[in-house]
């Protein structure tokens, strides 16, 4: 008997030795090519870069993975306990691998298999860290062995808190959220400190199947999984029975960010993204660096600018009439038929509807949700001139675009025309608002910064400014009559025309700009010389390489809305150089400043000089200097306020503010512009087709774009006081006769003269251009008089 027992013991000992040997060999074999886990000590997870408006509203988030890193000491114990209960009951006691858990899971899975239930895993939190950071998701014995070895090794080097920090910041929770902080924001719009027990349990339940556990699709399953975690928390002694019951009884309510915490500014955010990537010279750093970017954007102005642009584009498009229905469908099963149609691009707040019946004075419509309503003929009058009956416009089965209004719906259509608007502070260069098109989701092409278009009469301002810089007085008389300019050997002569084909005779230079006279502008250009006009266009940043041709003075050069708005901002601020900028400040993931635009205090950025003991990106600062002298600048400003008071911008006078501005219309009315300004704000807007074509025979900056400016200013600037432009000491204001330019006590206009020209104020003859061999007067034919140039 003893011999048998001794023999059995020897066999058992041999088996143990063999087992230990095999285990040692396995550990040795698989340990030879293990990944370096020391990298975990240098863990800097990819983090979300966030862009904010100047007043603190979230504009956009950019990331390859939406993750917000939060240190373990900032994660509440209730959230940690939720994960311990859900994922690894013995986390604080095992050495990385839970042998008891493996045995328990094995027996449990036998029962689960027999009863057709889901299999239970036995991976510890440490093993999940190893899988997420160091290994792949490959299902193999080799990976599991390496996972166990690494988990044991990591547990000897890292504390439990360090392992938890890695796990809670790396795990995927669905909805694009990586880490518990991102999950708390995405699902509940809360920080981790604000989560309730029920919300913590919900987040802890997600790692098992983050894509499937969606309460909006499968509420019962998600609640069951959450309640399981709550029950485990109670069983493990983390919460009381009453707390568990209260948590289980609470519904799962997902919350998005409150609307007042965010601002929609897609074009602006895209511009900021490109600008910061250029600054950093790294796309990777932008998308993974967890940057906080404070911009110049004013959230209120941005929303108003977007509203005004869309309103203006829609109103202009409606003036062109109704094009046609989107489709025509059978009415037998209209609700299903309309659902089959692809949603038109840029539908926005508009809706699709189908015409169910038509009467003379209204149309009955059905909407996708099955509801029915009416459109009265009054809401279709824009569609066709002298519309007498709806039956001549629509028929049964027509699919149309409608807009909800107070007492029903109105017929609408998505505009084909596009445009842009930009709002700047002329003194600082801050871009307060920028909308690059009707709808970013349809077209990401930014018409503020990317669209090169002809500015038309907007460029005339700088021809007159060049004249003022060179000593020509504002009351100088020029002849608004037909002219002919030689363009060189073998080239036909150029005969510019005024917009309406009329001639005003002898008028002052001021009147020439106020009335946007083409012929006066050309005569002023010949008096100054093209070389000086090319110089001023470059100086103001309108175009870096303008062609030295006379048509340039009437706006044949190409420029962008951003450049043109900035050029007028220089005029608005008294002639000092300014550049549009979008970015005020950038912080890294640790809150340290890596870029600040200048040394002015940014009260809303929570910045102090104590933050600045780090390497700051060297962003070259532009020297502040004058682009034009302040006297000439005030004179041209006076001209431009006159254009609002008496001419093409007159409609803006109803705003009741002192405003300078200029309209612009290119040849054939393909591009229309308006830039208006006060001492505190400059607003530029543009309307045109992306593929240039005529907007209409009588389409001008005055009737297409100026309404956008007026709508914006009436909302954004209505409570601001009307501020006068500062009169420099080098200017003397004198009353003159508007028609003749002569000084008179009862003058009809207050003119701005340079002090050093006071002694020459006796009105002189108009400038004699007869010495210029390239220009001469001519008598126009009837055909010439009928032609128009803008």
From Swiss-Prot:
Q: List where the protein spans the membrane.
A: 7-27
Q: Name one GO molecular function term.
A: peptidoglycan glycosyltransferase activity
Q: Which InterPro entries match?
A: Beta-lactam/transpept-like, Glyco_trans_51, Glycosyltr_51/Transpeptidase, Lysozyme-like_dom_sf, PBP_transglycosylase, PCB_OB, PCN-bd_Tpept
**Known EC number:** 2.4.99.28, 3.4.16.4
Question: Which reactions does this protein catalyse?
Answer: [GlcNAc-(1->4)-Mur2Ac(oyl-L-Ala-gamma-D-Glu-L-Lys-D-Ala-D-Ala)](n)-di-trans,octa-cis-undecaprenyl diphosphate + beta-D-GlcNAc-(1->4)-Mur2Ac(oyl-L-Ala-gamma-D-Glu-L-Lys-D-Ala-D-Ala)-di-trans,octa-cis-undecaprenyl diphosphate = [GlcNAc-(1->4)-Mur2Ac(oyl-L-Ala-gamma-D-Glu-L-Lys-D-Ala-D-Ala)](n+1)-di-trans,octa-cis-undecaprenyl diphosphate + di-trans,octa-cis-undecaprenyl diphosphate + H(+); Preferential cleavage: (Ac)2-L-Lys-D-Ala-|-D-Ala. Also transpeptidation of peptidyl-alanyl moieties that are N-acyl substituents of D-alanine
Q: Which residues form a coiled coil?
A: none
Principal place of residence = membrane
Keywords, in A-Z order: Antibiotic resistance, Carboxypeptidase, Cell inner membrane, Cell membrane, Cell shape, Cell wall biogenesis/degradation, Glycosyltransferase, Hydrolase, Membrane, Multifunctional enzyme, Peptidoglycan synthesis, Protease, Signal-anchor, Transferase, Transmembrane, Transmembrane helix
Q: Which residues lie on this side of the membrane: Periplasmic?
A: 28-790
Mode of membrane association: Single-pass type II membrane protein
- Function, please? Cell wall formation. Synthesis of cross-linked peptidoglycan from the lipid intermediates. The enzyme has a penicillin-insensitive transglycosylase N-terminal domain (formation of linear glycan strands) and a penicillin-sensitive transpeptidase C-terminal domain (cross-linking of the peptide subunits).
Indicate the family of this protein: In the N-terminal section; belongs to the glycosyltransferase 51 family.
Put simply, this protein is called: Penicillin-binding protein 1A
Instruction: Give the species this sequence originates from.
Output: Rickettsia felis (strain ATCC VR-1525 / URRWXCal2) (Rickettsia azadi)
Q: What is the lineage of its organism?
A: Bacteria, Pseudomonadati, Pseudomonadota, Alphaproteobacteria, Rickettsiales
Gene for this protein?
Answer: mrcA
């Amino acid at each position: 008997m003893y011999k048998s027992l001794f023999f059995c013991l020897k066999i058992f000992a041999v088996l143990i030795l063999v087992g230990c040997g095999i285990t040692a060999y396995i550990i040795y074999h698989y340990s030879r090519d293990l990944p370096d886990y020391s990298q975990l000590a240098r863990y800097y997870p990819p983090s979300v870069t966030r862009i904010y408006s100047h007043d603190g509203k979230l504009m956009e988030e950019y990331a390859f993975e939406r993750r917000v890193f939060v240190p373990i000491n900032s994660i509440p114990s209730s959230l940690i306990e939720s994960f311990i209960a859900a994922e690894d009951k013995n986390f604080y006691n095992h050495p990385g691998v839970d042998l008891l858990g493996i045995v328990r899971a094995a027996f449990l899975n036998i029962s689960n298999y027999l009863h057709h239930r889901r299999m239970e895993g036995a991976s510890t939190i440490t093993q999940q860290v190893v899988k997420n950071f160091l290994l792949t998701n490959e299902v193999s014995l080799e990976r599991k062995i390496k996972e166990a070895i690494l988990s044991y090794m990591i547990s000897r080097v890292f504390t439990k808190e360090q392992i938890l920090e890695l796990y809670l910041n790396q795990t995927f929770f669905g909805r694009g959220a990586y880490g518990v902080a991102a999950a708390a924001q995405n699902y509940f719009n809360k920080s981790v400190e604000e989560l309730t027990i029920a919300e913590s349990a919900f987040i802890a339940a997600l790692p098992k199947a983050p894509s499937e556990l969606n309460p909006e699709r499968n509420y019962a399953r998600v609640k069951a999984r959450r309640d399981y975690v709550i029950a485990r928390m109670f069983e493990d002694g983390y919460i009381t029975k009453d707390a568990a019951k209260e948590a289980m009884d609470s519904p799962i309510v997902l919350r998005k960010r409150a609307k007042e915490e965010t601002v929609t500014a897609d074009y602006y955010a895209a511009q900021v993204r490109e600008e910061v990537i250029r600054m950093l010279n790294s796309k990777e750093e932008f998308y993974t660096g967890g940057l906080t970017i404070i911009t110049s954007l004013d959230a209120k102005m941005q929303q108003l600018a977007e509203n005004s642009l869309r309103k203006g584009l829609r109103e202009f498009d409606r003036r062109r009439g109704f094009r046609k229905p989107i489709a025509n469908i059978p009415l037998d099963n209209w609700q299903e038929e309309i659902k089959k149609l692809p949603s038109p691009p840029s539908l926005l707040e508009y809706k699709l509807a189908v015409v169910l019946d038509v009467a003379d004075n209204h149309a009955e419509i059905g909407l996708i949700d099955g509801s029915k309503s009416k459109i009265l003929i009054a809401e279709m009058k824009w569609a066709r001139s002298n519309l007498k009956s709806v039956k001549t416009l629509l028929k049964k089965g027509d699919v149309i675009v409608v807009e909800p209004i107070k007492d029903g719906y109105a017929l609408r259509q998505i505009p084909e025309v596009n445009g842009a608007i930009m709002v700047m502070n002329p003194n600082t260069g801050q871009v307060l608002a920028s909308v690059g098109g009707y709808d970013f989701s349809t077209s990401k092409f930014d018409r503020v910064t990317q669209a090169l278009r002809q500015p038309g009469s907007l460029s005339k301002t700088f021809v007159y400014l060049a004249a003022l810089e060179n000593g020509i007085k504002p009351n100088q008389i020029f002849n608004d009559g037909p002219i002919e300019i030689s363009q060189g050997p073998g080239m036909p002569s150029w005969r510019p025309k005024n917009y309406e084909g009329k001639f005003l005779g002898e008028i002052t230079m001021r009147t020439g700009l106020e009335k946007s006279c083409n012929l006066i502008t050309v005569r002023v250009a010949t008096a100054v010389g093209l070389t000086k006009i090319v110089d001023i266009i470059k100086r103001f940043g309108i175009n870096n390489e303008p062609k030295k041709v006379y048509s340039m003075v009437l706006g044949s050069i190409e420029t962008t809305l951003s450049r043109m708005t900035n050029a007028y901002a220089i005029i608005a601020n008294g002639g000092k150089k300014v550049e549009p900028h979008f970015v005020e400040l950038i912080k890294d993931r640790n809150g340290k400043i890596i870029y600040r635009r200048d040394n002015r205090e940014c009260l809303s950025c929570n910045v102090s000089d104590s933050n600045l003991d780090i390497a700051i990106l060297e962003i070259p600062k532009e020297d502040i200097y004058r682009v034009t002298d302040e006297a000439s600048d005030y004179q041209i400003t006076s001209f431009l306020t006159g254009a609002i008071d008496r001419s093409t911008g007159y409609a803006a006078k109803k705003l009741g503010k002192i405003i300078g501005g200029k309209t612009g219309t290119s040849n054939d009315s393909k591009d229309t512009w308006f830039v208006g300004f006060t001492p505190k704000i400059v607003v530029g807007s543009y309307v045109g087709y992306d593929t240039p074509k005529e907007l209409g025979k009588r389409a001008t900056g005055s009737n297409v774009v100026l309404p956008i400016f007026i709508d914006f200013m009436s909302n954004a600037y209505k409570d601001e006081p009307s501020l006068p432009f500062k009169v420099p000491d080098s200017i003397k204001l004198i009353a003159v006769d508007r028609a003749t330019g002569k000084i008179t006590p009862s003058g009809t206009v207050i003119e701005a003269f340079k002090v050093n020209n006071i002694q020459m104020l006796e009105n002189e003859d108009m400038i004699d251009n007869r010495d210029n061999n390239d220009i001469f007067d001519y008598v126009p034919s009837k055909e010439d008089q009928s032609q128009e140039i803008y």
